[in-house]
Design a protein with these regions (language model features):
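Predominantly extracellular beta-rich ligand-binding scaffolds that present long acidic/polar faces
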Residues: 1-169
Length: 169
């Protein structure tokens, strides 16, 4: 299976892609199976497989984010009709972090997506740092009053978070 994100930055259109992932490594910053950052369209894609390891970041500007499809779905990003069947087991650095079945952090639009995998996240020694974990997205944010859309999605898997300051959805 795929060992690293397929694409660093998507600004185009990715469609009808099937990816089997086998990430088992220490990862830094933002990670997703298909793309680290999405500013384009990702449609009708499916990811399966296993993700495990330790995630860190520089803690100043870039924090650890993991998503089954995209690590971060930016304001212009659209993820539509995608499925994640991943088994995720990550240990996060003691800093603010995000993990989601489809996107770690969603500032754009995610619609008609399904996540059925297992998400297990552990963070130790990070009492003051929030860990945002969700079946579809770890966190949804608006930017300048725009974006941050999640509609007609389903998570039918299991989520387990072991952290002192966690937010689970």
């Amino acid at each position: 299976g795929l060992k690293k994100p397929l694409i660093a930055m998507n600004q185009g259109k990715i469609r009808n892609l099937r990816v089997v992932a086998d990430f088992n490594d220490d990862m830094q910053n933002v990670q997703g199976v298909i793309t680290q950052y999405n500013e384009g369209n990702i449609e009708d894609c499916m990811v399966t497989g296993t993700i495990s390891g330790y995630m860190g970041g520089n803690g100043a500007v870039v924090y650890p984010e993991f998503g089954g499809i995209a690590g971060e779905n930016a304001l212009a990003g659209i993820i539509f009709g995608c499925t994640s069947k991943l088994n995720v087991n990550l240990t996060m650095a003691p800093m603010k972090s995000w993990v989601g079945g489809i996107a770690g952090l969603n500032i754009g639009t995610i619609s008609k997506c399904v996540s059925t995998g297992t998400i297990r996240v552990t963070q130790t020694n990070g009492n003051e740092y929030p860990v945002y974990v969700g079946g579809i997205a770890g966190e949804i944010q608006k930017f300048g009053g725009m974006g941050g859309v999640l509609k007609e999605c389903l998570h039918a898997g299991k989520i387990t978070v072991t952290a002192a300051n966690n937010c689970v959805g």
